[in-house]
Amino acid sequence: MTEVLDLHGQDSDGGSEEMVLTPAELIEKLEQAWMNEKFAPELLESKAEIVECVMEQLEHMEENLRRAKKGDLKVSIHRMEMERIRYVLSSYLRCRLMKIEKFFPHILEKEKVRSEGEPSSLSPEEFVFAKEYMDHTETHFKNVALKHMPPNLQKVDLLRAVPKPDLDSYVFLRVKERQENILVEPEADEQRDYVIDLEVGSQHLIRYKTIAPLVASGAVQLI
C-alpha cells in the first residue's frame, strides 16, 4: 500500500480543500474517526469521503491479492490486515447507525437548521435512512397506539419523546495539538468557571461539551 490518494475536505472558509494521503494515513484517519465516534455521546460529522476511499482501497488490495503468488506469507499478512480494516470500517458504520436510531429526531432537526457550508452529520445514505426510520416510527406509533386515543392526543412530538444525546457526559481524550485557555464549567453551583491548558500527549477526563469543538477539529482524540 504505497500509492497516494486524494481526499477532499473543507477549509475554514467552507471551500474545497484537497488533502493527499498515503494508504497508511487514510487508515489512520479511519481509525481516528472510529474511536471518536465510538466514545462521543453524539453523532459526529460524516466522514463519507474517508469511508469511500477506504472501500476503494480494500477493493484494490483484493485485486492485488488475487494476482499474488499463492502460499506467499505476505499474502496471509495482507489478508489479515484487510480483515482488520474491514472490522474497523463496519464497526464505525454500525456505531453511526445505532446513534441515528437512538437520536434520529434531534439529528434530523440539527440537519434542518444547519447553515450552508457547515459540515453535515449525515452522509446522503444516512440521511435517507434517518428519514425512513422516522417515518416508520411515526407510522408504528399511529397504528399501535395513537389511532386509539382521543383526537387531541393523536400527535406525538418526537423531539420531546426521544432523549437528546448527553453532552454533559465525561470522556477520555488524548491531546494532539496544544490548546490554551480551555474554559471548564464548574461541577457544582458554588464553584466558578476556570481555564486549563492542554499539552500535546497529555490525557484527560473531561465533560464532552467542553471539548466537542476540539474533537471536530482533530485537536484531541477520544480514547
Swiss-Prot record:
Residues modified as N-acetylmethionine: M1
Keyword Glycosyltransferase: no
Tissue: Highly abundant in testis. Weakly expressed in thymus and bone marrow.
GO terms of biological process kind: DNA-templated DNA replication; inner cell mass cell proliferation
InterPro entries: GINS_A, GINS_bundle-like_dom_sf, GINS_Sld5, SLD5_C, Sld5_GINS_A
Keywords of the record: Acetylation, Chromosome, Cytoplasm, DNA replication, Nucleus, Phosphoprotein
Family: Belongs to the GINS4/SLD5 family.
Function: Required for initiation of chromosomal DNA replication. Core component of CDC45-MCM-GINS (CMG) helicase, the molecular machine that unwinds template DNA during replication, and around which the replisome is built.
PANTHER family: DNA REPLICATION COMPLEX GINS PROTEIN SLD5 (PTHR21206:SF0), SLD5 PROTEIN (PTHR21206)
Protein name stated in the entry: DNA replication complex GINS protein SLD5
Species this protein is from: Mus musculus
